[in-house]
UniProtKB/Swiss-Prot annotation:
It is an enzyme of class 1 (oxidoreductase). It comes from Homo sapiens. The modification Omega-N-methylarginine is found at R21. GO terms for cellular component: brush border; cytoplasmic microtubule; cytosol; extracellular exosome; microvillus; mitochondrion; nucleus; plasma membrane. It is found in: Membrane. Catalyzes the NADPH-dependent reduction of several pentoses, tetroses, trioses, alpha-dicarbonyl compounds and L-xylulose. Participates in the uronate cycle of glucose metabolism. May play a role in the water absorption and cellular osmoregulation in the proximal renal tubules by producing xylitol, an osmolyte, thereby preventing osmolytic stress from occurring in the renal tubules. Homotetramer. The keyword Acetylation applies. This is L-xylulose reductase.
């Protein structure tokens, strides 16, 4: 199915690894013009070699002022993928201020800031656009040791709906994708233990974790005009986890 993304300028955060990197690669293959944002210069350097022509931006999105400097003059952006996130997992009784602050700075506050920058540009140009927020199955189901992470993703789902409500009159669609575990470097850090993985897999009717391409395909669909009547949605890519 043709998604007609060629020539569109797309900003992707968390572009250095995992889902973000896969999204950049897929967008580049469609002919889209990609602005790839990561806090790790080495990841951006290797990504530029793989996808010549993309525009790399190295910034820590947890730093509001640095983000404003890096992206405030990024130029016209048609589509946005808010993928950057951290997963600092602690038992509830051991949650630290540092983990809480860092998690909400990157997983929620940065989404607001980057989306404001992109949406204001779209509105000023008088053109439609689309934003996809990468959330999680943890936004709607509790997982042990994920109290802060689950909270950031639950907040992100509601933010997605409010953004859709307020930006809809400007013809800007906003949706979320909610994947199950994906065995990226972040996923492996948490779920590589077979016993722990089994406890999660037992809650997934399809009995498997997601691949990066499963999530990327959902993101590209929501960016494209093929989903032109879809906004404010949370699209599960979780093998039926929410059905249980």
């Amino acid at each position: 199915m043709e998604l007609f993304l060629a020539g569109r300028r797309v900003l992707v955060t968390g572009a250095g690894k995992g889902i973000g990197r896969g999204t950049v690669q897929a967008l580049h293959a469609t002919g889209a013009r990609v602005v790839a944002v990561s806090r790790t210069q080495a990841d951006l350097d290797s990504l530029v070699r793989e996808c010549p022509g993309i525009e790399p931006v190295c910034v820590d999105l947890g730093d509001w002022e640095a983000t404003e400097r890096a992206l405030g003059s990024v130029g016209p952006v048609d589509l946005l993928v808010n993928n950057a996130a951290v997963a600092l997992l602690q038992p509830f009784l051991e949650v630290t201020k540092e983990a809480f602050d860092r998690s909400f700075e990157v997983n929620l506050r940065a989404v607001i800031q980057v989306s404001q920058i992109v949406a204001r540009g779209l509105i000023a140009r008088g053109v439609p656009g689309a934003i996809v927020n990468v959330s999680s199955q943890c936004s709607q189901r509790a997982v042990t040791n994920h109290s802060v992470y689950c909270s950031t993703k639950g907040a992100l789902d509601m933010l997605t709906k409010v953004m859709a409500l307020e930006l809809g009159p400007h013809k800007i669609r906003v949706n979320a994708v909610n994947p199950t575990v994906v065995m990226t470097s972040m996923g492996q850090a948490t779920w590589s233990d077979p016993h722990k993985a089994k406890t999660m897999l037992n809650r997934i009717p399809l009995g498997k974790f997601a691949e990066v391409e499963h999530v990327v395909n959902a993101i590209l669909f929501l960016l494209s005009d093929r989903s032109g009547m879809t906004t404010g949605s949370t699209l599960p890519v979780e093998g039926g986890f929410w059905a249980c």
